[in-house]
Amino acid sequence: MSQTELIKKLREATGAGMMDVKRALEDAGWDEEKAVQLLRERGAMKAAKKADREAREGIIGHYIHHNQRVGVLVELNCETDFVARNELFQNLAKDLAMHIAMMNPRYVSAEEIPAEELEKERQIYIQAALNEGKPQQIAEKIAEGRLKKYLEEVVLLEQPFVKDDKVKVKELIQQAIAKIGENIVVRRFCRFELGA
């Protein structure tokens, strides 16, 4: 594959600008995977700069599963109504709603989890490791690892994205921020399941 074709391929895959893609490829020695990683890191840096800006516009994304037994509403905010009408933004809202329907998170971010719940889970994991005969220090390290897994189960932003499990939901949002150029925030969601 020529350099030009590689640049074009990465632009389409990442939504990054041509010069950003070219720089990332040059920095990565024209290694496609390393370049994608660099673009993701740089996208995250762009996203971090925009994170302080207030997001008050947006849409309510929705998804009803084909069996009509699971439905989701998700409030996705951005800075301007222009972006709220953007197809990329609207598709992100729909994808997030579908993800929530499939993965059933309980919280948007780790900050929403009550401290008592986190400590309770941590103590359960420590006790389980101690019951397996592990020393206290090792048990605490094991508990931290299991707590990280727990966060991936219950926190939307920490979950691997249902359409591409190599990307966490928060990274997907950072990529969208980098492409759109505005802060994007998942404000809240509500998941309904028949009989649950």
From Swiss-Prot:
Residues 80-83 are annotated as: Involved in Mg(2+) ion dislocation from EF-Tu. Associates with the EF-Tu.GDP complex and induces the exchange of GDP to GTP. It remains bound to the aminoacyl-tRNA.EF-Tu.GTP complex up to the GTP hydrolysis stage on the ribosome. It is found in: Cytoplasm. InterPro entries: EF-Ts_dimer_sf, Transl_elong_EFTs/EF1B, Transl_elong_EFTs/EF1B_dimer, Transl_elong_Ts_CS, UBA-like_sf. The gene is tsf. Keywords: Cytoplasm, Elongation factor, Protein biosynthesis. CDD domains: UBA_EF-Ts. It comes from the Bacteria. Disulfide bonds: none annotated. The keyword Protein biosynthesis applies. GO terms for cellular component: cytoplasm. GO terms for molecular function: translation elongation factor activity. This is Elongation factor Ts. Belongs to the EF-Ts family.
